[in-house]
Amino acid sequence: MRKILINFAALLALTSMSLAVAAPSLTHPSAVDASGTFSIHGTPPQAFANIAVIEIGGNDEYGWKATPPFYGFVRLSNKAQTDYKLFKPTIDGNNISFKTRAVGGISYEFEGTFSSLDFAEKDMRNQVVLKGTLKKLAAGKVTAEAKLDFDYTPGG
């Protein structure tokens, strides 16, 4: 009887260990990846006509985890290619919002929604994947606001 109990205890311990190894970890859910380069779809209103792209950094060692962190930028199409660096965006599911640092008293704010977050895997280049409201601010006051669609543009 003692031998049966020892064998049973060993089998139980082995089974518990194999379940612990095989079970997926639920303590670290995968982070949402909304990184990419996005350009305004169609002809934008005059106040936003000089925006070349919006770049959103990834949650990796080259983006949010870099030192210092890279969250992205709003880049103008002027000769200097002025970048308005993003503060850390807020991402909740498919929703994103961000603000930029001011350059010469001008800054931008955005609130929008991704149609899906697998646009890179599905190679959805030049397709609308993000819609939202972009605001241009001067000295902290809104000077222009528009509902815009953005295409995914691989490689910027």
What kind of region is each of these model predictions?
Residues 1-9:
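Bacterial N-terminal signal peptides that target proteins for export
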Residues 8-18:
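Bacterial N-terminal signal peptides
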Residues 20-22:
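Signal peptide processing junction and immediate N-terminal pro/mature segment
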Residues 24-156:
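Central antiparallel beta-sheet cores of small beta-barrel/beta-sandwich binding domains
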